[in-house]
């Protein structure tokens, strides 16, 4: 049924200009908001921060809301002039993480480091100086959270 609903959604004139969509379990989700919430659950794909955009019923699509985020060709991520994506590392942080888990990224051609922290994207004191050093070397550092919903806030450390 998911494949059928996906085809119905893609073919529907109502889906035009809605960006990339996910049609699963009778729902229509915006791809930017879709998260896999469970390792084995059949209804694992959800949009916990925004909810479903609509649903498919009896071969017809019904939209309840629209996405306000820029998407597809209007996205802020323009990669049309890139020949290759930059080398970016992801640090899955945890309590008492050691600096040597991050230090190799500073001298091996990384252009960015994504810090996937606990809670509000918290950075453990052991690696804070290494990430500061990375910034001083021109490496972009992004603080994120492994928690599937909610933002990371400024000045959380």
What would you call each of these model-derived segments?
Residues 27, 95, 148:
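Short, glycine/serine-rich, charged loops/turns that create anion-binding
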Residues 14-19, 24-25, 49-50, 85-88, ...:
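Short coil/turn connectors at secondary-structure junctions
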Residues 4-11, 54, 128, 132:
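Predominant activation on well-ordered alpha-helical scaffold segments within soluble catalytic domains
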Residues 30-115, 120:
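Accessory alpha-helical/coil subdomains and C-terminal extensions
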Residues 21-25, 92, 116, 144-145:
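Short beta-strand segments
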Residues 1-3, 35-38, 105, 128-130, ...:
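Short, glycine/charged-enriched secondary-structure capping and boundary segments
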Residues 1-34:
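Short, glycine-/small-residue-rich phosphate/pyrophosphate-handling segment
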Residues 120-157:
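C-terminal non-catalytic interaction/assembly regions of soluble proteins
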